[in-house]
Every structure is written in structure tokens, then in C-alpha cells.
């Protein structure tokens, strides 16, 4: 499958989401990342293992390593009566991924990271969830003391 979209940052964010979702289902981090990156690229029995892009690994490992902190941040921005446990796994994973990129990737402007995760949300969730994710992450961006507003 030849596709100029593959390996774009948007594509890699989507693959990071897929890997993180699989990790939540019990998959090992590296195996989940390799599968998410290569499932549509590797064919045949003698296919070589693909080198994972740094951006993809940074997202997956970063979210995995900061999961508790990210969950606490998400919880503090939920409306009264809501808890992390009430969120779907899809929405939780998208929020963690978006929040991680906003918080830790200085080279990505906050609004770009926000818009990109909304596009992934529209693909893997519904419009209501995309609006919810937009609202929560927008609130975080507007309140963050050193927000990268570019």
C-alpha cells in the first residue's frame, strides 16, 4: 500500500492511539507499537521488521510512562459527577495522547496538537466524543501556565 499520508505526524498519532489502545487490552508496548506501525506495511513470510519512527515511540512510551499524571490531569478537568472510570477507553486513550503531546512536545504548538487529536477522535469515536475531547483539552490549554499558544 503506497500512501503519502503514511509516516505523516497525523498518521503516526493515529498509530500511537492504536498502540496505546492495544496496550490497555494487555499488549506489550513494543509489540503493540510494531503492530500499529506495520500492520498495513509488512507482507509475506520473510518481511523484515520495520524501524519504528521516533515520534511514534515517543508518544507511546511517553503516554505509558506518564499515564498516572495524565489521568490525574484529566480527572481535574472533568465536570462534577464525572470520573475517569465513566469515560470510554477510546476517549481516555485519546485524551491521554492529546494531553501528553500538548504538555511535553514543545515543538508542536498546543492548538496543532489539539486539532490533530480531534481529527483522530472523529475517526475512532463519534462527534459527541470529539466535542468532549476538544472541550477538555481546550480548557487545559487555556489554563496551562506555560501554554504554547502558537
UniProtKB/Swiss-Prot annotation:
Q: Which GO terms describe its cellular component?
A: cytosol
Respond yes or no to whether keyword RNA-binding is given for this record.
Answer: yes
**Sorted UniProt keywords:** RNA-binding, Transcription, Transcription antitermination, Transcription regulation
UniProt KW RNA-binding keyword:
yes
Report the domain of life of the source organism: Bacteria
**Short name of one Pfam family:** NusB
Query: InterPro entries attached here?
Result: NusB-like_sf, NusB_fam, NusB_RsmB_TIM44
Question: Alphabetically, which GO biological process terms does the record hold?
Answer: DNA-templated transcription termination; transcription antitermination
Q: Which GO terms describe its molecular function?
A: RNA binding
Main role?
A: Involved in transcription antitermination. Required for transcription of ribosomal RNA (rRNA) genes. Binds specifically to the boxA antiterminator sequence of the ribosomal RNA (rrn) operons.
Task: Please give the NCBIfam families that the UniProt record associates with this protein.
Answer: nusB, PRK00202.1-1
Q: Which family does the record claim for this protein?
A: Belongs to the NusB family.
What is the name attached to this protein's record?
A: Transcription antitermination protein NusB
**Gene designation per UniProt:** nusB
